[in-house]
C-alpha cells in the first residue's frame, strides 16, 4: 500500500496531560509512534497530522487528495460535533 494520512483531531495534544482518569496516560506522541510502528510492519508509508484548527484539517485532507494518498484515517476527537466542513472534505 502507498501513502496513508492519519489525522488526529482537536484536543488530542492534551492526551496524557489532562483527563487522565478518562483517557489514560498515553500521549499523542506515543499514540503516533505506535501507529507508525505498526504501519512500518505492514509496509505502509504513514504521515501523521494533528491540528486543533478545523481549517488546517480540511487543508490537509485536500492536500492528501492532490498528493495521491491512497487512504486516510481520521480520529475526529473534538470535531465529532462540529464537522460539517470536514465531512464535506472527506466526501470529496
Give residue ranges: language-model regions:
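Extreme N-terminal starter segment of soluble prokaryotic enzymes
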Residues: 1-4
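ATP/NTP phosphate-donor binding region
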Residues: 12
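Glycine- and acidic-residue-enriched helix-capping/strand-helix junction motifs
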Residues: 15-30
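Generic alpha-helical secondary structure signal
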Residues: 26-29, 33, 55, 84
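A short, N-terminal amphipathic alpha-helix
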Residues: 31-46
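Helix-adjacent hinge/juxtasegments
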Residues: 42-91
Amino acid at each position: 500500500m502507498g501513502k496513508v494520512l492519519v489525522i488526529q483531531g482537536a484536543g488530542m495534544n492534551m492526551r496524557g496531560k489532562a483527563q487522565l482518569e478518562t483517557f489514560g496516560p498515553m500521549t499523542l506522541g506515543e499514540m503516533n509512534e505506535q501507529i507508525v510502528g505498526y504501519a512500518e510492519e505492514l509496509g505502509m508509508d504513514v504521515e501523521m497530522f494533528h491540528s486543533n484548527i478545523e481549517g488546517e484539517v480540511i487543508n490537509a485532507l485536500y492536500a492528501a487528495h492532490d498528493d495521491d494518498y491512497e487512504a486516510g484515517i481520521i480520529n475526529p476527537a473534538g470535531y465529532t460535533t462540529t464537522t460539517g466542513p470536514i465531512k464535506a472534505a472527506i466526501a470529496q
